[in-house]
């Protein structure tokens, strides 16, 4: 069987030669043939089947074939680019729409409901937490008086914990202060008035039976005020830490600069002392040889200044005349 028969079949070849098809139909037929034989046979063999057609038809088919090849290469390049970039724009749009749909939408009714719940809530402040009482235990004890929302306890500082462990304390976590949110401000106020300065109670074998509550209701105080306060304290702590680090860095730079200056000054002094000793040895070579190690001159610089005689136009008396005048004065006195 010939190549044309393998591509199109013998019957299709006869029909194609006899019938007068339009250009669009010819293009579609060629595209189908090329797509079916693209993986097994080269496209150039298709032209051998059309030997009976005219030269004009062959030229038109060649043009269509070139156009199809260009289109196919462009499609393959775009598909590769889409695979490399992670998908086409349509796929990205679908992903974004899915993510948008997955986000839970809050209606105005829910927003209003949350606002009212926040307005109804009340917060109690505990200035002292019983030793080793965890937030879950605190919630369990106070939940019998009313519905509790959120609980926050401040753990002890690392310095206090380290000191406590050095003194033989327990390794369990201790808390210093805390805040408890009740869903009803009335319940929170009544609980604070009822339990303040009273024993925790419960079973006598309980760890916290003899401890005393120390709590206070905070009027017009909401949970977001607490979060804002904690955020402000953390920001202030970070700023102080940055300032201390910067100050320590400056002190270290100044210390290193002083060390370098001290080394430089020490080197200058050493060179000067060596130079002065050389000058002394050159000025008094005999004396330095005779001196012992204990009586050697010090390394300090010695300078000698020669006194010049007084120059004057007056006739200054000699030493003998001065002595004679002194004797005459003494004779008159005594």
UniProtKB/Swiss-Prot annotation:
Predominant location category: nucleus
UniProt biased composition (Basic and acidic residues): 61-84, 286-297
Matching Gene3D superfamilies: 3.30.70.330
GO biological process, one term: small-subunit processome assembly
Localization annotation: Nucleus, Nucleolus
SUPFAM superfamilies documented for this protein: RNA-binding domain, RBD (SSF54928)
Gene Ontology annotations for the cellular component aspect, listed alphabetically: nucleolus; nucleus
Keywords from the named record: Nucleus, Phosphoprotein, Ribosome biogenesis, RNA-binding, rRNA processing
Keyword Phosphoprotein found: yes
Residues bearing the modification Phosphoserine: 22, 51, 53-54, 85, 88
Listed Acidic residues bias regions: 10-25
The family this protein is said to belong to: Belongs to the ESF2/ABP1 family.
Role, per record: Involved in the small subunit (SSU) processome assembly and function, and in the 18S rRNA synthesis. Required for the early cleavages at sites A0, A1 and A2.
The name this protein goes by in its record: Pre-rRNA-processing protein esf2
Organism, scientific name: Schizosaccharomyces pombe (strain 972 / ATCC 24843)
Gene (name only): esf2
């Amino acid at each position: 069987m010939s190549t044309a028969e393998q591509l199109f079949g013998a019957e299709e070849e006869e029909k194609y030669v006899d019938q007068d098809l339009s250009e669009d139909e010819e293009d579609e037929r060629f595209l189908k043939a090329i797509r079916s034989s693209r993986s097994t046979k080269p496209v150039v063999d298709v032209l051998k089947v059309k030997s009976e057609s005219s030269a004009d038809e062959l030229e038109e088919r060649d043009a269509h074939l070139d156009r199809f090849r260009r289109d196919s290469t462009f499609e393959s390049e775009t598909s590769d680019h889409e695979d490399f970039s992670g998908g086409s724009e349509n796929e990205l749009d679908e992903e974004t729409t899915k993510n948008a749909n997955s986000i839970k939408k809050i209606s105005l009714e829910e927003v209003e409901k949350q606002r009212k719940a926040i307005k109804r809530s009340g917060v109690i402040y505990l200035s002292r937490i019983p030793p080793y009482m965890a937030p879950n235990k605190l919630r369990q004890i106070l939940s019998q008086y009313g519905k509790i929302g959120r609980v926050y306890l401040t753990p002890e500082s690392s310095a206090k914990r380290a000191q406590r462990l050095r003194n033989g304390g327990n390794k369990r976590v201790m808390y210093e202060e805390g805040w408890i949110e009740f869903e009803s401000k009335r319940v929170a106020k009544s609980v604070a008035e009822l339990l303040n300065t009273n024993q925790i109670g419960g079973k006598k074998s309980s760890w916290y039976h003899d401890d005393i509550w120390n709590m206070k209701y905070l009027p017009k105080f909401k949970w977001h005020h607490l979060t804002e306060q904690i955020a402000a304290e953390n920001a202030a702590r970070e700023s102080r830490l940055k300032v201390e680090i910067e100050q320590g860095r400056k002190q270290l730079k100044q210390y290193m600069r002083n060390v370098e200056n001290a080394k430089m000054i020490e080197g200058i002094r050493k060179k000067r002392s060596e130079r002065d000793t050389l000058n002394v040895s050159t000025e008094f070579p005999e004396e330095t040889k005779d001196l012992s190690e204990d009586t050697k001159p010090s390394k300090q610089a010695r300078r000698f200044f020669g006194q010049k005689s007084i120059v004057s136009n007056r006739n200054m008396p000699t030493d003998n005349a001065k002595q004679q005048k002194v004797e005459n004065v003494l004779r008159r006195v005594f």
